[in-house]
Design a protein with these regions (language model features):
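N-terminal structural segment of carbohydrate-active enzymes
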Residues: 1-162
Length: 162
């Protein structure tokens, strides 16, 4: 497992609100290095007792491989947190090895009840959600390639453009 290939940041294009209820979360890994990724997630303030011990309540969901650019693979998932906030970390599976990837880095073996190596999305703020203006639906977009309008070498009969 290429540990240097793992990257996530709680913000920007890696974790953001799609709408008032949904978070979109992405993880970047080295290309063709990881077999699967699961997201361990839950509300940061939901705790319960298991075997007489207070533990953070969390769920595990598989992420989907969204694409690759030949250097990195990109994994993603959409989550609907019940209270618009989320604590989460990743379970990364590769070559029979499973590691936990969180804010503090990579940990092996993973601790299912981990509360110290997590990412936290504090709250889905309506002001942070992108809303396209109404006029954009009626817009016609053009791509202009200026180099295709003038060929200074036209007399030579070549197809060369500037």
């Amino acid at each position: 497992m290429n540990k240097a290939g793992l990257y996530h940041h709680c913000g920007d294009q890696w974790c953001y609100a799609l709408d008032n209820d949904t978070l979109h979360i992405r993880l970047k890994t080295a290309a063709d290095d990881i077999d699967s990724v699961d997201l361990v997630h839950g509300d940061p303030f939901e705790w319960g007792k298991i075997d007489g011990k207070q533990v953070w309540r969390s769920n595990i969901q598989p992420m989907t491989k969204a694409g690759t650019n030949g250097v990195h693979d990109f994994w993603e998932i959409r989550i609907t947190p019940p209270y618009k906030r989320l604590k989460y970390w990743f379970l990364v599976h590769a070559n029979g090895e499973t590691c936990e990837f969180g804010e503090k880095g990579l940990v092996s073996p993973p601790d299912r009840w981990n509360t110290w190596n997590t990412f936290i999305f504090p709250y889905i703020q309506p002001a942070e959600i992108f809303h396209a203006p109404e006029w954009i639906a009626d817009t016609v977009w053009y791509q202009i390639f200026p180099e295709r309008y003038h060929n200074p070498d036209a007399a030579s009969g070549t197809e060369k453009n500037t």
